[in-house]
């Protein structure tokens, strides 16, 4: 079986409309949303990555505001979900197998050392040498 990359590839996946712990459910629901809103149609720019990055920055700002302003956790969680939906949509727009890339990246970061910086601990291959 080939991996699903495009919106149309995901539309045939049966999915639940309730949390079930499934990557397939999340991706197929986001693909259904992209299809419904016609994001890939010419002139809609819904798959234009410049536009999508701008939306991501906007949503990240909303998450930041919810946290820094001490809003209820439910509001921050909703903004976090907006970011996840956008990121999953980015993989559709770019026709990237995000699940595969996630596992490749996790394999890589698990080999890195944690480093403590001025603001806190992080895991990176960056070196200030």
Locations of regions flagged by a protein language model:
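Flexible "arm" and connector segments at domain edges
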Residues: 1-80, 84-129
